[in-house]
């Protein structure tokens, strides 16, 4: 198991499934990921529950409730790392090397527009030309001043913080937590009401979680993109997931959308929404031996919670010694 978990961590570290990749290429990488994980899912995974009407309803109705990370009691769960200093230094290196001035020079001469058209299409190139021609000279001069970029990096820092927070609150990704060890005193104490709850045993080895197949909203959902809901082992490391590149691309797309009314010019790693939720501290959490079910569904964005059919994967129930 430890060998597999090391291979899984290495796979996530080196693999990027870009949002603009050809379907054949992205499908190949998804299949590689599933072929690595599915044969290594333990026969028994356990979910500890307190005695509440919600837990009882899930059990009765054959559901697994997933939720956004912000609903977890641990406020540092799914907290990613972004290298703000690197971003700031990169921006000012570009500025100090005359990059901004050169950009404006090519705008004025028209040299930049064929490049934009080649990369992003004629429509965006025409919008860029129109914006440049309508920008007053005093505004252009202000953009060329170093104080503008100091203010820009300060505002960028605020945007980065907002995106880091959004990882925990974004309703596209919802989580359910499981463990390999039903006898863990730590898990009974913290997640089963201090031994007064219960634990459910699941066998997910043959669970065909292809998302849309089991989604109750599939007939009314306009987006039939595959939802790769499955279970993955948590990676215990004192190094958090470095989301610098993904978040900068997301922010850049956000800025470009506000300027050009276009979407997703820069590709984003689709595994970003997996990696963000699969890293936890080695020293504080390794004893949990946790696996996570990650649900990504575009038709379930109206709530912090989503119910996933358990497909009769429950094999046993264990009562805590203090259950009433």
Q: Where are the regions that the model predicts?
A:
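Partner-binding and oligomerization surfaces adjacent to conserved cores of proteins
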Residues: 1-324
């Amino acid at each position: 198991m430890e060998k597999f978990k090391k291979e899984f961590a290495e796979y996530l570290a080196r693999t990027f499934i870009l949002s603009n990749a050809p379907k054949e290429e992205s499908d190949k990488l998804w299949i590689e990921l599933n072929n690595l994980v599915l044969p290594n899912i333990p026969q028994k995974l356990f979910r500890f529950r307190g005695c509440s009407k919600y837990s009882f309803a899930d059990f009765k109705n054959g559901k697994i409730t997933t939720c956004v990370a912000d609903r977890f009691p641990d406020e540092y769960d799914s907290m990613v790392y972004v290298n703000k200093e690197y971003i700031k230094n990169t921006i000012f290196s570009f500025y100090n090397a005359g990059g901004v001035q050169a950009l404006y020079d090519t705008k004025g001469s028209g040299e930049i527009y064929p490049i934009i058209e080649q990369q992003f299409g004629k429509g965006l190139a025409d919008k860029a030309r129109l914006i440049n021609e309508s920008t007053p000279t005093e505004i252009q001069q202000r953009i060329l001043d170093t104080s503008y970029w100091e203010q820009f990096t300060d505002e960028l820092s605020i945007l980065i913080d907002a995106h880091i927070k959004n990882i925990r609150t974004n309703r596209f990704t919802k989580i359910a937590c499981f463990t390999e060890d039903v006898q863990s005193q730590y898990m009974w104490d913290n997640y089963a009401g201090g031994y007064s709850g219960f634990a459910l045993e699941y066998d997910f080895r043959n669970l065909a979680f292809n998302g849309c197949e089991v989604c109750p909203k599939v007939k009314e959902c306009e987006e039939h993109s595959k939802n790769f809901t499955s279970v993955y082992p948590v990676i215990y490391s004192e190094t958090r997931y470095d989301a610098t590149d993904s978040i900068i691309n997301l922010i850049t797309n956000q800025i470009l959308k506000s300027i050009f009314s276009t979407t997703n010019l820069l590709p984003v790693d689709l595994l970003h929404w997996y990696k963000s939720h699969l890293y936890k501290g080695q020293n504080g959490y390794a004893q949990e031996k946790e696996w996570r079910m990650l649900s990504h569904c575009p038709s379930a964005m109206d709530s912090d919670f989503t119910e996933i059919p358990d497909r009769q994967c429950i094999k046993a129930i264990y009562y805590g010694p203090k259950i009433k």
